[in-house]
Amino acid sequence: MEVKADSRYRFNRKKVRESVAKLLAEQNIKQKVELSLMVVGERKIRELEKKYFGEDKVTDVLSFPQMVGKRIPGDEAVLALGDVVVCYPQAKRQALKFNRLLDDEIEFLVNHGVLHLL
């Protein structure tokens, strides 16, 4: 899983990777997957929400399927899932609201996004 995040957005990347691996195993996904995670600010998530979903608002997580129901051409062993985008400031607010650790909230949002790709 590729993780892209500005260095100012601190979270436990290893924990997120392990959590996604566990989730995929629980969903009986045994082959390798291609999955990208982006952790962004409010401006970027608002831009994506408006461009792809027509709403001018900040949201916590977005999912973008790469190849619905298809494998990466030329590599039958890899399943192309797509991209998950998490809004760090929104995750931080939700962690406070629900009395959770920020790492736990980000993990929850990433897993939620991945489930939308399956």
Specify the residue positions occupied by each region the protein language model found:
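An acidic/histidine-cluster motif and surrounding catalytic segment
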Residues: 1-107, 115-118
